[in-house]
Amino acid sequence: MRPGFHRVAAMLLLLAVTAFAADKPQIFIGKVSDAMCGAQHMMAGASDADCTRACVKQGSKYALVVGDKVYTLEGGDAAALDKLAGQNAIISGTLKGKTITVASVAPAK
């Protein structure tokens, strides 16, 4: 075998395992918002929920604010996300970059 073959094989295996792990569903707990406002709602006189709904109606996507991070939500039950706008929720889904592909949505207790 050529020198370095084992190193290349190990690197490819590590990349494959990392890619597989990225597709594994995770649980996220945070506040349902929209991708435009994130954690800072800007609509004067409106609640966070009303601002979120207005922004989504204008074309923004739902988002989940977890600490200081804002994740855009793809897919999922739009009616459930609308109901939980401005509230804490438990989102199950796969994370890729800053986007969560939603598998399920539930209110946080």
Please give the residue ranges for each predicted region.
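Bacterial N-terminal signal peptides that target proteins for export
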Residues: 1-10
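Conserved RNA-binding domains used in RNP assembly and mRNA/RNA metabolism
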Residues: 17-109
